[in-house]
């Protein structure tokens, strides 16, 4: 299973924001610089994370981006489900466009579905807080990357 860059970058944004002090804000430019990601692409991700309620964007002179929830309330499996456009591992998972002739009798489909569910179940066991246990090291590394 390979996550899309979109989902990976969404998780990176959350890690970046989680590494900040509680009331500290940042901006898309700083996050993009830290991860060498296009600001344009990142703005779409930030917009969606805001719509999903994970982050808040504050406009104005003292504006910026910060987490909208405590890290312990952000479940990694949920973020993956909400940002990953297509969790279909194989053609037969798709509701439309399945042309595999084996589908009516295929047992592989069930095994792969079970594997996907196990993958997501493991991610459901982690919150952003779990991933931020060594927050000081993460913060230091990100500060270096921003310059």
From Swiss-Prot:
Function: Nitric oxide-responsive transcriptional regulator.
Binding locations of [2Fe-2S] cluster: 92, 100, 106
The protein's name in its UniProt record: HTH-type transcriptional regulator NsrR
InterPro entries: TR_Rrf2-type_CS (IPR030489), Tscrpt_reg_Rrf2 (IPR000944), WH-like_DNA-bd_sf (IPR036388), WH_DNA-bd_sf (IPR036390)
Annotated GO MF terms: 2 iron, 2 sulfur cluster binding; DNA binding; DNA-binding transcription factor activity; metal ion binding
GO cellular component annotations of the record: cytosol
Necessary cofactors: [2Fe-2S] cluster
Organism the protein comes from: Geobacillus kaustophilus (strain HTA426)
Pfam families linked to this entry: Rrf2 (PF02082)
Superkingdom of this protein's organism: Bacteria
HTH rrf2-type domain sequence ranges: 2-133
DNA-binding region (UniProt annotation): 28-51
Lineage: Bacteria, Bacillati, Bacillota, Bacilli, Bacillales
Coiled-coil positions: none
Record's cofactor remark: Binds 1 [2Fe-2S] cluster per subunit.
Gene3D superfamilies: Winged helix-like DNA-binding domain superfamily/Winged helix DNA-binding domain
UniProt KW keywords: 2Fe-2S, DNA-binding, Iron, Iron-sulfur, Metal-binding, Transcription, Transcription regulation
């Amino acid at each position: 299973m390979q996550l899309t860059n979109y989902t990976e970058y969404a998780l990176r944004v959350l890690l970046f924001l989680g590494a900040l002090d509680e009331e500290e804000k940042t901006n898309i430019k700083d996050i993009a610089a830290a991860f060498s990601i296009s600001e344009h692409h990142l703005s779409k991700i930030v917009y969606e994370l805001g719509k999903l309620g994970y982050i808040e964007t504050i406009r104005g002179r003292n504006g910026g981006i910060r987490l909208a929830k405590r890290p312990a309330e952000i479940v990694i499996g949920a973020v993956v489900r909400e940002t990953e456009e297509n969790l279909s591992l194989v053609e037969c998972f798709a509701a439309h466009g399945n042309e595999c002739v084996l589908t009516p009798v295929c047992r592989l489909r069930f095994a792969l579905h079970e594997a996907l569910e196990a993958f997501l179940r493991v991610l459901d066991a982690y919150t952003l807080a779990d991933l931020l246990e060594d927050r000081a090291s993460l913060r230091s590394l990100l500060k270096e990357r921003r310059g």
